[in-house]
Amino acid sequence: MDLEAARNGTARRLDGDFELGSISNQGREKKKKVNLIGLLTLFRYSDWQDKLFMFLGTLMAIAHGSGLPLMMIVFGEMTDKFVDNTGNFSLPVNFSLSMLNPGRILEEEMTRYAYYYSGLGGGVLVAAYIQVSFWTLAAGRQIKKIRQKFFHAILRQEMGWFDIKGTTELNTRLTDDVSKISEGIGDKVGMFFQAIATFFAGFIVGFIRGWKLTLVIMAISPILGLSTAVWAKILSTFSDKELAAYAKAGAVAEEALGAIRTVIAFGGQNKELERYQKHLENAKKIGIKKAISANISMGIAFLLIYASYALAFWYGSTLVISKEYTIGNAMTVFFSILIGAFSVGQAAPCIDAFANARGAAYVIFDIIDNNPKIDSFSERGHKPDNIKGNLEFSDVHFSYPSRANIKILKGLNLKVKSGQTVALVGNSGCGKSTTVQLLQRLYDPTEGKISIDGQDIRNFNVRCLREIIGVVSQEPVLFSTTIAENIRYGRGNVTMDEIEKAVKEANAYDFIMKLPQKFDTLVGDRGAQLSGGQKQRIAIARALVRNPKILLLDEATSALDTESEAEVQAALDKAREGRTTIVIAHRLSTIRNADVIAGFEDGVIVEQGSHSELMKKEGIYFRLVNMQTAGSQILSEEFEVELSDEKAAGDVAPNGWKARIFRNSTKKSLKSPHQNRLDEETNELDANVPPVSFLKVLKLNKTEWPYFVVGTVCAIANGALQPAFSIILSEMIAIFGPGDDAVKQQKCNMFSLVFLGLGVLSFFTFFLQGFTFGKAGEILTTRLRSMAFKAMLRQDMSWFDDHKNSTGALSTRLATDAAQVQGATGTRLALIAQNTANLGTGIIISFIYGWQLTLLLLSVVPFIAVAGIVEMKMLAGNAKRDKKEMEAAGKIATEAIENIRTVVSLTQERKFESMYVEKLHGPYRNSVRKAHIYGITFSISQAFMYFSYAGCFRFGSYLIVNGHMRFKDVILVFSAIVLGAVALGHASSFAPDYAKAKLSAAYLFSLFERQPLIDSYSGEGLWPDKFEGSVTFNEVVFNYPTRANVPVLQGLSLEVKKGQTLALVGSSGCGKSTVVQLLERFYDPMAGSVLLDGQEAKKLNVQWLRAQLGIVSQEPILFDCSIAENIAYGDNSRVVPHDEIVRAAKEANIHPFIETLPQKYNTRVGDKGTQLSGGQKQRIAIARALIRQPRVLLLDEATSALDTESEKVVQEALDKAREGRTCIVIAHRLSTIQNADLIVVIENGKVKEHGTHQQLLAQKGIYFSMVNIQAGTQNL
């Protein structure tokens, strides 16, 4: 009887899962060989208890799996009894009452069978519970061990390993990969054994009860298997193609979102949208082809299934009529084999999960087994009692493991006596920081040795060595806990008094006492709640509580403004007393009083001595000091280059900061914390996105209504096939009462043909159902994606500044949201229609044939349905709850891994490990509770079927004996309703996750409906006929929305008349680039106004306004297309003719270079223009700006990134471009702006000085000192 459960649930579950996983993955795995670990290795962390759990779980799974085939034996015997006795009940009701005898016998027989069913049900109840809960328990225990071991292994790796691995990847491994293992070693293994047991038991029962029929049915199975395999192959080929097309669309979107400022400034939104839609169209076409081919094969599969029913019934009936089998036997064989065959489908997702787990475990176990050369957990090595602090580097060579071919140190020799302060100076990238890292033994030198007190540091115990060293680095990392805890990381057993003493020494006591929570103030993620100077002082206190013998200060004050610098510097001078100190500084004024100053160049020390000695030598140090003569205001070129816009500067005032990231791969751990915030963001989003009704989503698909009509009709037909099957089945059983054999054979032939007919019908209905909904779904996905992309391009800059809308997050949203919504509309609707039709027609037919039994069964259906739904919910909910629970642990892990350098230099690995382990108890306790709950719901949903069989047939026999129903009607009612219910229970399992889809839809609609503050698509506002080009800023006040508390412009007023050139100068972060962004109307000022030709910018149409401006920025972004297309991007309002492109190129001095390229103007420039040099990119950007014939030209440090040679060429091009246009120039190289009509010096967001070059020099103010500093630079 359970055939249908099998057909409806499992068969379809089989399609569902194939589609989702197994085959498409196999297809992909062939392409890239995935490393898997051995089957048993996966369980290498199981102890005897786990093994016992797994052993008992497997035994019970096998027992549980054998239940259904055994039930079929009972069913067969019962059918025989019914059929034999039916002859006695063909008389009218009143007779049967008088002939009590056979009725009494039948009822007794039925009662006995009811007990058998109940017995089996009881067995299944226990077995299913043990199977699921024991496997889940064992998995939970092992996963906890794996997480601990894995985190421990990560913490003990050496730095070089992290440089190569990248920290973000490790975080995903710790969360996603471990949960893949957990998926693969838990209840899925039990399910697998259960399915395999069902398979074998089914076939064994089949062979014992009737081998002939078994062989005939088996002959058909290969064809069915083959059709499934072909189907899966087709699917995976199309899926790969579709993914490739979507990936291309994704790349376009990512490129546009990554360069959003350029796109908006040049009005390129529609161009990007068209490029995106072109790729989406391709994907859609492939998707539709996929829907056609996949559904043809699905139709064929159903045709084959029905054909096999027809053959089996026809052959079976022949055997029954020739008295070889009884009808019961034939039934037993038929259903046992079917159940057995379909159980294979159920094993597929389990095998898939297991393969995923083996793949994930390969990487994880590999890391666990990796033994680092520098092991901070090791107890080996010398642990000296007291350290004097004499350091010596002798002939040290070194290159970073991640870039082994670039040598950083090339034979470094340096001696530091105990208690001395040595300062290291030199250009960026010369090896200063590397020296500090080698001393902490974060790396080992490739040649040479480093010794402390004459002992090679490799002989020290690693932990001991690091405990005697205190480090304060340029970007101190604080952990998101309280101030006191942060200081305690310096030394675990430190008392509150010691903390206060250290804080006083670090000049931090006063500001801490002013905070409301004092020492218990939380510092936020990476110390975000504190200013740079405050963080720095806490880091110094943290280094001091260690009471280190050796203090390493790596640009400890570079991130500070003058005021905090003085305080921190005083703290450092106090801290240095009596300790051996190595200082790295770019501000040379801070190291004048060092005992020894060592000048680095190119990985070796070229000079050392005191300040006065080195000044006499006139070497490197002398040159560096001269550049900085003005002292107060460093304009050292080398940093300014790296600062692409002042936003970066605003985040961290340091000039050197960006430079360091580029220079030093070792700073990788500064990788943006945003990536790890993505998960949290999704939660933030969930909280504030209003939910969306299902109908609203459907409305988007309303143009495709004909597809929906056809699809729904077919789905209803598919649903009705099942009750039709029940009718034919009951009719066939009824044939085999006493009677004429020839008539029987004739009827059987007829019914077999009807089965075949149903098969042909199902081919068409399944194909049409799948195809129509599939096509409508593809159209919807394409539509949603392009609407979403369009809506994103429409947003204002402040929206893009929000970390929740980083390029990565937006690209992911574009890719996943639309697909998830499709999952919940197309196929889901089809399934709902199909299952409702199934249960609906089933109930109607049942009421017609036997309302009493139908009522009894309907009272049971809710239980079966609810149990099915609960089980599916449990399955889905598991992962979600675990994720929540794991977040606390994940936070600790993420923090430790991202800031691994800090953790290691503070020797706090053990502390983090114990915090992590403590946080794992929650998820583990959860998994125990979950194991039991899940076990109970699963066992109830599995056993209920057996109990309902018992009740149904016992009551059925009563109805038959009393003449209320015929036997065939009992079978009909029973199969129609039970199968309908089973289908309903399963519907929830293969319908894609509805909740996810709702969330995605909600997110998409909130995006579609968001009204940007400055709408780039808007047609409102004035479109003046002519524009002279004068620009005025009137008392403008502005802060960036993402950092509302950091003032940028504080009442800025300036004016530039038409045709004039205005130059803006000032230190980084003073608001120069902000002026350009306000003019482009990326943002609106908070107070004051920006006027163009006397009209307020807000009143002008945005598109018109931007069309008047041409912008060339310091780091111009080019798109991955040809040179001609990049230049033409300057004017997206029309198709730019080729001769104009050439003219612009000539004006920008780039034409001769383009002519030398083989493909000339059709040369592709590569991603972000990587195929070109800086100067070439810069000149193409100038040509791009000139194409639009702008009235106002904005040059934001357009030459700063260039070497002298290219600078000259580009500068000429710019001078040519400025003719007859209003021009606003931002420059750090003052020589380039001497001939500007007006020079404005900005400081702290206000105008401090203005005038021509000569006037300003005469004032001897800020501009004067800046020119002087740079005059020194020229002799470099």
UniProtKB/Swiss-Prot annotation:
Cytoplasmic topological intervals: 1-47, 137-185, 236-293, 352-708, 774-828, 871-930, 992-1276
Enzyme class: translocase
Domain ABC transporter, first and last residues per copy: 391-627, 1031-1269
Post-translational modification: Phosphorylated. Phosphorylation is required for PC efflux activity. Phosphorylation occurs on serine and threonine residues in a protein kinase A- or C-dependent manner. May be phosphorylated on Thr-41 and Ser-46.
GO-annotated biological processes: bile acid secretion; cellular response to bile acid; lipid homeostasis; phospholipid translocation; positive regulation of cholesterol transport; positive regulation of phospholipid translocation; positive regulation of phospholipid transport; response to fenofibrate
Function text: Energy-dependent phospholipid efflux translocator that acts as a positive regulator of biliary lipid secretion. Functions as a floppase that translocates specifically phosphatidylcholine (PC) from the inner to the outer leaflet of the canalicular membrane bilayer into the canaliculi between hepatocytes. Translocation of PC makes the biliary phospholipids available for extraction into the canaliculi lumen by bile salt mixed micelles and therefore protects the biliary tree from the detergent activity of bile salts.
Molecular function per GO: ABC-type transporter activity; ATP binding; ATP hydrolysis activity; ATPase-coupled transmembrane transporter activity; phosphatidylcholine floppase activity
Domain of life: Eukaryota
Gene: Abcb4
Reactions it catalyzes: ATP + H2O + phospholipidSide 1 = ADP + phosphate + phospholipidSide 2; a 1,2-diacyl-sn-glycero-3-phosphocholine(in) + ATP + H2O = a 1,2-diacyl-sn-glycero-3-phosphocholine(out) + ADP + phosphate + H(+); a 1,2-diacyl-sn-glycero-3-phosphoethanolamine(in) + ATP + H2O = a 1,2-diacyl-sn-glycero-3-phosphoethanolamine(out) + ADP + phosphate + H(+); a sphingomyelin(in) + ATP + H2O = a sphingomyelin(out) + ADP + phosphate + H(+)
Designated name of the protein: Phosphatidylcholine translocator ABCB4
Quaternary structure annotation from Swiss-Prot or TrEMBL: May interact with RACK1. Interacts with HAX1.
Keywords carried by this UniProt record: ATP-binding, Cell membrane, Cytoplasm, Cytoplasmic vesicle, Glycoprotein, Lipid transport, Membrane, Nucleotide-binding, Phosphoprotein, Repeat, Translocase, Transmembrane, Transmembrane helix, Transport
One GO term describing the cellular component: membrane
Binding positions for ATP 1 per the UniProt entry: R403, G429, C430, G431, K432, S433, T434, Q474, G1174, G1175, Q1176
